[in-house]
């Protein structure tokens, strides 16, 4: 295991103003060394003149399609882009660009053709959702100021004229449309060039039960090469929905398993490369549910986690070389190899399994840190971008919150 780049101690602590100032100082020093190129100036937060305390944890990492940069969404309302160095860095890995929105980002999605070297500016974008606001489209171009959004999309419920928060978003394969998930199991489709939705669909009480009013579409299956016109979504009621994007049709295909009495909803759905299996990662759970897309209605196996996922989520990654990867509380990454993931952990004649332990564990850090997010380089699967931190919910007043973003290469 080799560390190629790390933010080191840049985001240690919770005094945002001090951390932002340190980041700006490190960026100035780095820019001074790069004499042949003028790096963009890091933008200031809307709250730079107000004393602000919160962890600067990266909650989402997205690679560019060409593997030359990553985009990170942070808890301090910041969006940062990092360039991938040609050689390992000894000093701090500082962001290439940094800008802020003026509120908490509930969900976001980067365009699948995103790259800092992309000439078409329509691909250099990110969609962001916040409470009580429209969905906003921002530019990821290095010369963008982002004082205002490029475009916005209505989230107003016309029945009560209230904003409905988009808790999940995904861009469709044609890259011209995107979908959102919100309360009452509502799924909405938008055209990038239209302010209002194209269509909306939600489950009725009859089809979803008495608690349908509280159901939230929390995630969509993640972008890969076998989406076709069918997408899947997870909910905080531990349900899985199947969506035909050619129409307004969606259907409930999997409900909470009768043996699952402790989990608190699905927050990530990963589809195997062959498109046959869904891996549903849940809050407050000790396992990952496996669902066969050809034989729906209930889980057919589970991946046994070596720990329990609590309030703070662990974002997993499907790696074309290593299989399914998910972080842990102790600096390790649990791994189920590619053969296991492509066949749902089942032998050829099996129709259901009894649970699969990790194939192996990969040590990422000698420190006792959480590996919050893992993202695989789409060009080189042996290179990972990871977000680490100490537990932000830990009840330890004397503990310094240590967060970082790292680039590592597996052997």
Curated annotation (Swiss-Prot):
Keywords: mRNA processing, mRNA splicing, Nucleus. The keyword Nucleus applies. Gene3D superfamilies: YVTN repeat-like/Quinoprotein amine dehydrogenase. It is found in: Nucleus. GO terms for biological process: mRNA processing; RNA splicing. GO terms for cellular component: nucleus. The keyword Nucleus applies. InterPro entries: SWT21/TCAB1_mRNA_Telomere (IPR051150), WD40/YVTN_repeat-like_dom_sf (IPR015943), WD40_repeat_dom_sf (IPR036322). SUPFAM superfamilies: WD40 repeat-like (SSF50978). It comes from the Eukaryota. Disulfide bonds: none annotated. Involved in mRNA splicing. Helps to stabilize the U1 snRNP-5' splice site interaction. Associates with snRNPs. PANTHER family: TELOMERASE CAJAL BODY PROTEIN 1. Belongs to the SWT21 family. This is Protein SWT21. The gene is SWT21.
